[in-house]
């Protein structure tokens, strides 16, 4: 059995909808194999939602105009194709737009049903004069890739329903490059860098995870031919081993103040792993453990790259400490003892 060092994946966030993913070390040649597969999957096979057809009050086809609207129907359709939407529904759903002029019609004027969200509300769709009025239905469906208006046209559809091109993919751009990286004395391993930019409907890490899931499912078909076939097995992750070692450390290694240490010990918290399983709210329930003790613990854990469990949204440890009377500085009934 051949055992290779397990690669690690790290994310470098460029902005909210663009990230670089670094996968290393990879066996020589696997950088391009994996990079090309991920890129093609990200661009073509990530599920999304888009408008598939519209119906405008008083309009029978796209080669016409709407009274009081500056843009003709063709321009209006081009603007609608720029809508970024997401839908939780597997079946088609309808959004409604009703606007009276004068003024701009934006995506914020669209009323989506529950489970559907418009992610670029500032998008300008049309311009109305004082007498202008726009009433429109927009049908949203889920899918993958690109579907033309011709394909969206349904047999026997109602008169006045106009199919539009649908771009379902939430991914805007994907590039990758492969660099050399070193493992001990060897310098021919691959380092894969994948740059992913998405629409507002999905974050890059979610798109990357979706692509990975799709590829695993497809490559699993080949594996099922002979599940006992020999391949390259991935060794244990160095990161996982280091994390396990940190979590197993006794809290004595944190070198906390005597007060904080004794409070944790009395609560039955003996290791770093048991400590990070508690939230700030949990720790404040411990007698004599106040906001200053929490700040001390958080600072020690941050130095190890760890953190406490998430507290409920809006939780303020200082306010909670005041409310429960947990005071680090004044407690007449508390007697400090040496660490035991």
UniProtKB/Swiss-Prot annotation:
Post-translational modification: The last 19 amino acids in the C-terminal part are cleaved in the spore.
Location of region: Alpha C-terminal domain (alpha-CTD): 243-340
SMART domains, sorted: RPOLD
EC id: 2.7.7.6
A molecular-function term among this protein's GO annotations: DNA binding
Swiss-Prot/TrEMBL keywords: DNA-directed RNA polymerase, Nucleotidyltransferase, Transcription, Transferase
Biological function: DNA-dependent RNA polymerase catalyzes the transcription of DNA into RNA using the four ribonucleoside triphosphates as substrates.
Protein family (similarity comment): Belongs to the RNA polymerase alpha chain family.
Domain notes: The N-terminal domain is essential for RNAP assembly and basal transcription, whereas the C-terminal domain is involved in interaction with transcriptional regulators and with upstream promoter elements.
Protein name in the entry: DNA-directed RNA polymerase subunit alpha
Gene: rpoA
């Amino acid at each position: 059995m051949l055992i290779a060092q397990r690669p690690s994946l790290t994310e470098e966030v460029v902005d909210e909808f663009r990230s670089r993913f670094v996968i290393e070390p990879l066996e020589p040649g696997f950088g391009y194999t994996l990079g090309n597969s991920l890129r093609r999957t990200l661009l073509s096979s990530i599920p999304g939602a888009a408008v598939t057809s519209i119906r405008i009050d008083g309009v029978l086809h796209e080669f016409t105009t709407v009274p009081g609207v500056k843009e003709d129907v063709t321009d209006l359709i081009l603007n609608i194709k720029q809508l970024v939407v997401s839908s939780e529904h597997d079946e088609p759903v309808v959004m409604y737009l009703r606007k009276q002029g004068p003024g701009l019609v934006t995506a914020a004027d669209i009323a989506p049903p529950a489970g559907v969200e418009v992610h670029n509300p500032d998008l300008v769709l049309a311009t109305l004069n004082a007498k202008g009025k726009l009433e429109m239905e927009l049908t949203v469906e889920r899918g993958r890739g690109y579907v033309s208006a011709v394909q969206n046209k349904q047999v026997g559809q109602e008169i006045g329903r106009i199919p539009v091109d649908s771009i379902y993919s939430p991914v805007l751009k994907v590039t990758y490059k492969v660099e050399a990286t070193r493992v001990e004395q060897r310098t021919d391993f691959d380092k894969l860098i994948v740059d992913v930019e998405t629409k507002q409907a999905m974050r890059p890490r979610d798109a990357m995870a979706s692509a990975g899931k799709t590829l695993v499912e497809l490559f699993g078909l080949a594996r099922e031919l002979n599940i006992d076939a020999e391949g390259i097995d991935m060794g244990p992750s160095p990161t996982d081993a280091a994390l396990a070692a940190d979590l197993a450390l006794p809290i004595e290694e944190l070198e906390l103040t005597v007060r904080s240490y004794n409070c944790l010990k009395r609560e039955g918290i003996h290791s770093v792993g048991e400590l990070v399983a508690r939230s700030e709210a949990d720790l404040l329930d411990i007698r004599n453990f106040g906001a200053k003790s929490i700040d001390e613990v958080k600072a020690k854990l941050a130095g190890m790259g760890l953190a406490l469990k998430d507290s409920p949204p809006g939780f303020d440890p200082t306010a909670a400490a005041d409310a429960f009377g947990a005071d680090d500085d004044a407690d007449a009934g508390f007697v400090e003892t040496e660490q035991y």
